Amino acid sequence: MVRIGVVVQRYGEDVIGGAETLSRDISERLNASGFDVTVFTTTAKDYITWKNHYKSGETILKGVVIRRFPVDVERDMDVFNTVSSSFFNPNNKKDITEEEWIDLQGPVSTKLVDTIQDEQDKFDIFIFFTYLYYTTVKTLKVLKKPSVLFPTAHEEPPINMKLMKDVFEKPDALFFLTGAEMDLVKNKFSLIGRTILSRTGVDIKRNVDESLFRRHYGIVSPFMLYAGRIEKGKGLEVLFDAFVEIRKKNMIDLVLMGKKLMDIPESDGIKYVGFVSEEDKASAFRGAVCSVQPSPMESLSITTLESFSQETPVLVNSACEVLMEHIKLSGGGLPFGNSDELIESFNTIYTSRNKRNLMGRIGFDYVKKYYSWDEVIRRISIPIREISNKKN
């Protein structure tokens, strides 16, 4: 039996985040398919402060052993943002080193790194989720065992730091969620390990009752849906501006679900529902006229795939290569570059039920073909076994 150590900054059923959810989905499915999986993570639940939330020690979730280690220091996001703004400004003199920036980024857990360094011979291979954090950068540095990395990378300042060369070039294989992500990383680094377009899996729920969400949240009018973190940097300002104009001509709502980290305009038709159950989320996607993903930087956008899985078309930011890849390969939505184009794309979908239904169906076919969990785990399992057998 192949013994796998998974390294990720946060982990748990109630932890919200793309890389974190990916790590849990893959860990549980690898464990269920015959691998022996142990997760090394921190006690943090909140990625803003890295505040210790869970108890240190060992627990088990759906058969996967979880070992949590305390975070040494909480993060002050205001200080971090100020320092980062200066650090990544090419016109400024660097007041800190790249290593010091990684420490500020966190979550710093020296006990986690030390434990893996001391106990790594108990494992055949390590899997790291996301390139960006202390837990990946520092642990890879001390690791002698085989490793693979899910970078979940997109174009952003930290990926251009010199120390990222070792992070991307040391692993024996890199697994990518999209072709755009793989191309980005290949263009930036001289990759020695294997590069594999693994994608990720989506739970395709059929026979979803689209009225369930409406009943629970009192939604009467047709609605557009945004699901994800509601924060600056996600392109929501363009969506809000466009919706004001859309609302003037159409009795339609804009429903927002997810964690609110920025102010939401007080405008007719904008409805914030917070976190919802998985059943309500599927129902919302099923019942929406369309979903909208306005973010300019995504490494996958699971919500786009969830929308397709409910046969609902998606409007996406054309500046994001990953989102454009989904649209080009599937035909399940339309792009926009600004608020005027968003309005135009929405009108194209809204005024033609036939076109909307067709986009929904071919979006579903795309997800079913490329993002079934059985196929994803097969694509991941084969190289993991081969690397483990070759290196040990």
Where in this protein do the model-derived segments appear?
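Donor nucleotide-sugar binding/catalytic pocket of nucleotide-sugar-dependent glycosyltransferases
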Residues: P146-P157, M164-D209, I219, Y226
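Conserved donor-binding/catalytic core segment of Leloir-type glycosyltransferases
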Residues: H216-K234, F240-V244
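Nucleotide-activated donor-binding/catalytic signature segment of Leloir-type glycosyltransferases, i.e.
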Residues: G258-S283, G287-C290
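Short acidic/histidine- and often glycine-rich active-site loop of Leloir-type glycosyltransferases
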Residues: P265, A319-S330, P335
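Aromatic "clamp/platform" in nucleotide-sugar-dependent glycosyltransferases that forms part
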Residues: P296
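Short hydrophobic beta-strand element within catalytic cores of glycosyltransferases
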Residues: P313-N317
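A short, well-ordered alpha-helix in the C-terminal region of glycosyltransferases
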Residues: H326, T348, K355-K369, V376-I382
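Conserved acidic donor-binding segment of nucleotide-sugar-dependent glycosyltransferases
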Residues: L329-D340, T348-R353
